């Protein structure tokens, strides 16, 4: 099979951007598909660590710096009316036209922000392959979890009458084992890895460890005011 994977306009597909879940999804998806023997075209920026058949640069690092205007990449907006989104999506559309074949898949990670790409190729299958966001639009969606799939159903439809969509699927997130090496000699602590926001459960982790008198190590982006 042939996959055209569209990344984001404000990141590079390298481990330096591990804090961006969607960029990591792109990088790891490319790794898996190439590992299975498929053809992978990656539409991204200039730096890339994913094994692909071709990297197609749709936005330069200089353009990214101008777009972020001093902000961290995790604060970037998902809005296809912004200039850098127009540059990225526009170039992706042009470059896709040079490479697309009849049964190819267009894999989108930016939700509705990348809808213009799907609209440019209505006769191809555009798949939102890592839905962990709210702005869905396509007929073909792969959700991160059943909980999130049903949240989206309730968000856009009458929750008492949702029958789902035949082409929706759930494929949990995938990781690289070498990023989590086995430690045979254990130390006495608990570990929280994730964004520092309450909805991810940091309050529960903190409360449990406080009550049990145990050490808690926390790793992840952001700073929640509830952290003590």
Regions found by a protein language model. Give the residues of each.
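Catalytic cores of nucleotide-sugar-dependent glycosyltransferases that transfer UDP/GDP/TDP-activated
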Residues: 1-228
């Amino acid at each position: 099979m042939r996959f055209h994977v569209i990344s984001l306009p404000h990141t590079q597909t390298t481990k330096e951007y591990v804090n961006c879940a969607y960029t990591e999804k792109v990088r790891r998806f490319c790794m898996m598909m190439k590992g299975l023997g498929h053809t992978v075209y990656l539409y991204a920026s200039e730096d890339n660590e994913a094994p692909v058949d071709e990297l197609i640069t749709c936005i330069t690092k200089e353009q990214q710096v101008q777009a972020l205007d001093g902000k961290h990449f995790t604060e970037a907006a998902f809005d296809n009316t912004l200039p850098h989104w127009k540059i990225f999506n526009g170039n992706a559309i042009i470059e896709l036209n040079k490479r697309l074949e009849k049964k190819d898949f267009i894999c989108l990670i930016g939700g509705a922000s990348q809808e213009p790409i799907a609209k440019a190729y209505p006769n191809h299958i555009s798949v939102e392959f890592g839905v962990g966001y709210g702005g869905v639009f396509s007929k073909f969606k792969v959700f991160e979890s059943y909980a999130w799939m049903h949240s989206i159903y309730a968000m856009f439809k009458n929750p008492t009458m949702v029958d789902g969509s035949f082409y929706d699927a759930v494929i949990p997130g995938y990781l690289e084992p070498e990023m989590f090496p086995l430690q045979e000699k254990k130390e006495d602590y608990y570990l929280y890895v994730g964004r520092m926001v309450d909805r991810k459960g940091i309050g529960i982790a903190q409360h449990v460890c406080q009550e049990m008198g145990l050490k808690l190590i926390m790793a992840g982006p952001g700073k929640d005011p509830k952290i003590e």
